[in-house]
């Protein structure tokens, strides 16, 4: 569950699609605090699961259908995206 409050503006590093799935890489800092692999981060309102964490960003798997049907479809390298961590259980 998310609060709907944007915590940080991130930047798209890359979107790599291979067939019907792909990887979205986002440059971020604040939303990484306390985040672990498997946690959820909303990217422009789309709930994605973190698959890797770097000191200045993260990656998440994304389906081609999600990109087609959401605001992620208009994202390019360098695009700003709204980021929000999921609420604690």
Kindly give the residue locations of the regions a language model identified.
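Conserved loop->alpha-helix
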Residues: 1-89
């Amino acid at each position: 569950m998310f609060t709907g409050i944007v915590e940080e503006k991130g930047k798209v590093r890359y979107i790599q699609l291979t067939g019907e799935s792909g990887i979205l890489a986002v440059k971020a800092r604040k939303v990484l605090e306390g985040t672990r692999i498997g946690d959820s981060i909303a990217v422009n309102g789309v709930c994605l699961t973190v698959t890797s964490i770097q000191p200045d960003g993260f990656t998440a798997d994304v389906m081609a259908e999600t990109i087609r049907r959401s605001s992620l479809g208009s994202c390019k390298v360098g695009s700003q995206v709204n980021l929000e961590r999921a609420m604690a259980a």
